[in-house]
Each structure stands twice: as C-alpha cells, then as structure tokens.
Amino acid sequence: AIHSDSYQYQMTYLKTEDKLKGDFKKFIVNNLSKLYSIESDNSMMEFEINNTNDKNAIVCYSSKKSDIDQDYQTLIDSGLQPRYNTSIPKLLQNIYNYYNLEKNDGYSLLIYIDQFKTHIVLIQKNQLLESRYFHIGLNYFINRLSKLGSGTLPTEEVRSTVFHFLENYGISKTKNKFELQDGFPYDDARLMLNELSSIMMNQMKDSINNFSTIQPVIGKNDFAFGGVYIGGPGSHIKNMDRLIRDTIGDPVENLNSITTTSFKKRLDSKMNFRTRVKENYILYNKKRSKNNLKNVQNKIQ
C-alpha cells in the first residue's frame, strides 16, 4: 500500500437510511458533490457500510486522482506493483486487523504521529468508527527546536542534532547527561519540548473527547480503552508513549514493535522449518547409508 500527504485524502462519516443502501454509491457521490464540491470523474473514492455505528457510511475520498494515477504508473514502470492507496485511518485499520490487535469488545485507539499531522482513529470489533486529526506532527517539534541552535550551527547540522535529541533524550522532566555538539542548548531544548508536547497532549485530549461515538472519556476512572497503539515518525520521540499513557490513562503499545516482532516470528518460523527439513534430510541419508552398508556387508558374507 502507498500513501502520500499530497493526495489529500479525507475521511467523512455519514448517516444513511436502510432504504438508501441499495443505491449507496449514488447517495455518496451526490452528498460529496454538495458538501465538498467533489467531481466524481476526477476523484478517488472508497466507502463501506458499518452497521455497528450510527454514522454507518464510512467514506474515504481524494480529489487528486490524476496525481495518484501518475504515481501508480511511475511505480509500475519502475518494476513495482502497488496493491492500493488510501488514507492513514484506513491503513491503520488494515494494520489493526492484519495483526489481530482486537483484545475485547471495547474501543481501541490508534494514534499515528506523521510529519505534519497526528491522526487519531477509533476502532471497535475491527470496524472503523471515527477518525480525527490535528496539525501537530514530528516537524512541529523539529522546526521549533532547530531555532535554538540556528545561530551557532549550520542548518542541516542543527536538524541532525535535533533528531538525535528527540530520539535519544526526548521528553523528560529531569535533566540527563547530554552528549551532543557544542552550541546546542540542551536545557532550553528540554524545557521547550516539554512545553510543545503539553500543547500536543491538550489537542489530543480535545480530539478524543470530540468523538461523537463515545462520551468525553479522558480523566474518567470508569472508562478504559480496549487497546491504545501509537505509530508513525513522531512515535520515535523518546518517552512519547509514556506521555500519551499518562494523558489517556491506559497502557500504550508501539505499532513498530508489534510489526517488527511479528516479522521476526515469521522469519524464525521459516528458519525453523528449513532447519527441520535439513535435519530430516540428513537423518534420512544417514539411515539410507546404514542400510546400503548393511546390504553390502550381507553380500560380502
């Protein structure tokens, strides 16, 4: 699957009546045309019915069909065969279902911190219920922290230093031993990152509490998500998972760790299978050699 911010995919969730489901596509096209001035011939659309939610029509659309088609053809000409492209919420749902992350019948929350946005996706019973996003991503932190060292270090060097700082030191209320280049103010960076991440958490809480499917839940002791998962470039900021855990009040798992572990298990399984085949082949040849030797001995006698 492929995705690009330049495709400008959008998600919308509509309420439909049972009598309209027979001509669902026409209903969707008409509504998108009225609401967003979308021309169906120049747009990419996918939709599905979700009977577990009041807003049961889940629609993903983009008006950048020509750009998407051009990128597809470029990949094909390069010898690659993309399967599909879609929005971040749909990709997260596919990952959620593929890795069987459903733990119970409760709501699961998937948070994807991209370069320029953070996407928040609500899933229940493997069905996508709602999604929201706000305009804070990894670049939000990098651009602001880079200004701290811009007077003493070259631009690319500053950004590289900020990357290192975010990944290895990250969000912390206490000072750590800092081993980076001279000219980058660690103490100022730590305080700024704490302030920026606090702004991010406030927007995240607002987004979650504005889901229409569930009542405002942040800070309520009687509510717990069935699972909370984070991914994306911004999830590599050290202690970001802990900050989200403290904000939401539920344990947080990293999608990168889950996908890597799953891949390693499959790889180990293949390796074990090959090893067993090899061992069985050696054992077979050993028995066969013994039998051949015994036959020769019998002939000699």
What residues fall within each predicted segment?
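Buried hydrophobic packing residues in well-ordered domains
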Residues: N31-L32, L75, I120, L145, ...
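Switch/connector loops and helix/strand junctions flanking conserved nucleotide-binding motifs
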Residues: Q8-T12, I142, I237-M240
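Short hinge/gating elements
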Residues: Q10-D18, D54-A57, G183-R190, V217, ...
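Small-residue (GG/TT-enriched) beta-loop-alpha framework at ligand/catalytic clefts
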Residues: N53-T161
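Glycine-rich phosphate-binding/hydrolytic loop that grips phosphoryl groups
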Residues: L91-N94, N139, S235, R242, ...
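Glycine-rich phosphate-binding loops at beta-strand->alpha-helix junctions
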Residues: G219-T247, E253
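Internal amphipathic helical hairpin motif
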Residues: S4-I58
